Amino acid sequence: MDYVKGIFKNRPNRFIAEVEVDGKIEIAHVPNTGRCKELLVDGAAVYLKPSDNPKRKTRFTLHFVVNKGELVSLYSQEANSIVYDAILDGKIKELQGYSYHQREKQVDDSRIDIYLANQEDDCCGMEFLVDSCYIEVKGVTLIVDGEARFPDAPTERGAKHLKELIKLKNDGNRAVVFFLIQHPAGNDFRPNWENDPKFSQTLVEAENAGVEILVYKCNNTLEGIELVPKSLDYDLSRK
């Protein structure tokens, strides 16, 4: 389905936006609960996908916004799919070599975004999994002077995910937090100490505990989104 171009006007709450389409104000679902205040500014060009579902409260979903001449993806949940597909395609060198791949692995009372492992057979021919790797994906849209930062608003949930990864690592598993920069202008990554010192400090603690940090970016076009197969640098220090 083709995208519909519009002009962003207002965001009454986290979930909806008022967008002008062909001279008429339409209500669009915003699939990103972050503030995105540096992106969603009055007059910004946006791209929407219409829905054929008559039961939906909103006719459109906001997928992209144009910022600094670049197409930025606002579909935060799409980050998980982009990373998962890139793993299957062998585009992430740090995550190659696994024979078992799973989305949304249940761990205690939480779900980890991606689970990788290797399949082996026991002496009776029964399959079992070894080399477990748990991956939590975070989509990043905030850019400050070419530097991607996460989160753009305080996130208790994000800090909780990091603590879960620390526990998994301490239990002998491989654990990874994967930051996918969804804004093409981002060239490296730093946690947002100014907006969320708790998450930022927990990220430092996670790295010290052995949780791996991977940073990649993606190319956005209206024809599709693809991960750029090259890891980027990060700096966890408080500036």
UniProtKB/Swiss-Prot annotation:
Disulfide bonds: none
Protein origin, superkingdom: Archaea
InterPro entries: SfsA, SfsA_C, SfsA_N
Pfam short name (any one): SfsA
Molecular functions (GO terms): DNA binding
PANTHER family: SUGAR FERMENTATION STIMULATION PROTEIN A
Family in the record: Belongs to the SfsA family.
Entries under HAMAP family matching the protein: SfsA
Protein name listed in UniProt: Sugar fermentation stimulation protein homolog
Species in which this protein is naturally found: Methanobrevibacter smithii (strain ATCC 35061 / DSM 861 / OCM 144 / PS)
